[in-house]
Swiss-Prot record:
The name this protein goes by in its record: LL-diaminopimelate aminotransferase
UniProt keywords, alphabetically: Aminotransferase, Pyridoxal phosphate, Transferase
Catalytic activity: (2S,6S)-2,6-diaminopimelate + 2-oxoglutarate = (S)-2,3,4,5-tetrahydrodipicolinate + L-glutamate + H2O + H(+)
Annotated substrate binding sites: 15, 42, 109, 132, 186, 291, 387
Function: Involved in the synthesis of meso-diaminopimelate (m-DAP or DL-DAP), required for both lysine and peptidoglycan biosynthesis. Catalyzes the direct conversion of tetrahydrodipicolinate to LL-diaminopimelate.
Keyword Electron transport applies: no
Residues annotated to bind pyridoxal 5'-phosphate: 72, 108-109, 132, 186, 217, 245-247, 256, 291
Length: 409
């Protein structure tokens, strides 16, 4: 008799974005002629950079010749992409990373969810709240979260990020073994300064805390004083794993490519206190469970770092950040309170008149035909907020702001 992992039964019935999709589909059934403007799920809308397309076309053509055909690649990724990553994402910022510390994958979401494979089930978890749901759900599956009580998991330490603390989390009062940080932040669109991030690195160093640092949106940082990598902070390689993605940087949501950095200086412990290098464990895990990202995909990712690729990708990022500027100004002109959107493609909107997140979601959908993401879906501290994304088409962005002005006047 096969027995299941009963921790899966603890998961809430639906993933946040599945619930949204059901509500939108119900609306479409009763309002088939209405145009919905989607500002909810953070999927991109602009095409891949021409340099990426050209590189992938060339890679496809290589597959048609016996002399240039590529079969299984290295589980860790091809050296040509790893070298480009190190040169452009780290060395350019004064950070030394070894090639064997970079692991190419099919995206940051997979790695964020899979990284727990090499960690015991009884580690204590800390998350900033509100939080990207994958951090919580993947730990529910692994049995680290306890039971759900009044919207919170009993064994998870929630660290509030609210307007009251300027969205800068305080150090936790309870002990945590593993801490998830995401900056620029999803969902609030806020950031940490170098000094604020240094506080967390020092805390981790002093308390043997492992930081899972998700910097999937670092390419959207506009302020030169905001760190792009946690490894810009001294000592961070001893305490942090960093996740990166080409999804929002270069529009790879449908291509799937990202990478994770696991420094060789980073250790965790056995029950009897022996230090174990996490780089070796992650490499072993990947060699067993992952056959590597496709050659064609990795050639496309490499092209992101070419001269033309950088220019084209930056132009697309600027397009989205202009959307964010239009949205933030438009929302503020409507008398709404909004955060984020300056160094991230997300805006965190305070719901008006004390409405709950889902109530405001429903009003926006049915009265304005705009879809956002209810803040409460990201955690208890998200109640009373709605996340909007700047990944839409420019015309849709302008139309959405016009609809809101008309609705709120």
């Amino acid at each position: 008799m096969a027995l299941i992992n009963e921790h899966f039964l603890k998961l809430q019935n639906n993933y946040l974005f599945s619930d949204i999709a059901k509500k939108v589909n119900s609306f479409k059934v009763t309002h088939p002629k209405d145009k919905i403007i989607r500002m909810g799920i953070g999927d991109v809308t602009q095409p891949l950079a021409p340099a990426v397309i050209e590189a992938m076309h060339k890679a496809v053509e290589e597959m048609a010749s016996k002399d240039t055909f590529h079969g299984y690649g290295p589980e860790q990724g091809y050296p040509f992409l790893i070298d480009a990553i190190i040169k452009n994402d780290y060395a350019s910022r004064g950070v030394f990373i070894e090639p064997s510390e970079v692991f190419i994958s099919d995206g940051a979401k997979s790695d964020c969810g899979n990284i727990g494979d090499m960690l015991r089930h009884d580690n204590s978890i800390g998350v900033t709240d509100p939080v990207y749901p994958v951090y919580i759900d993947s730990n529910v599956m692994s049995g680290r979260t306890g039971v759900l009580e009044n919207g919170k998991w009993s064994d998870v330490v929630y660290i509030p990020c609210t307007a009251e603390n300027n969205f800068v989390p305080d150090l936790p009062s309870r002990r945590v073994d593993i801490l998830y940080l995401c900056y620029p932040n999803n969902p609030t669109g806020t950031t940490l300064t170098k000094d604020e991030l240094k506080k967390w690195v020092n805390y981790a160093l002093a308390n043997d805390v492992l930081i899972m640092y998700d910097s999937a949106y670092e390419a959207y940082i506009q302020d030169p004083n905001i760190p792009h990598s946690i490894y810009e902070i001294k000592g961070a390689k001893k305490v942090a794993i960093e996740f990166r993605s080409f999804s929002k940087t270069a529009g790879f949501t449908g291509i799937r490519c990202g990478y994770t950095v696991v420094p060789k200086e980073l250790n965790a412990f056995t029950l009897d206190g022996q230090r174990v290098q996490l780089n070796k464990l992650w490499n072993r895990r990947q060699c067993t469970k992952f056959n590597g990202t496709s050659y064609i995909t990795q050639r496309g990712a490499e092209a992101v770092y070419s001269t033309a690729g950088k220019q084209q990708v930056t132009a697309t990022i600027n397009y989205y950040m202009t959307n964010a500027k239009i949205m933030k100004e438009g929302l503020q002109n409507c008398g709404l309170t909004v955060y984020g959107g300056d160094n991230a493609p997300y805006l965190w909107l305070k719901t008006p008149d004390g409405l709950s997140s889902w109530k405001f979601f429903d009003k926006l959908l049915y009265e304005v035909k705009i879809v956002g993401t209810p803040g409460v879906g990201f955690g208890p501290s998200g109640e009373g907020y709605l996340r909007l994304t700047a990944f839409g088409d420019r015309d849709d962005t302008l139309e959405a702001m016009a609809r809101l002005r008309k609705w709120l006047r």
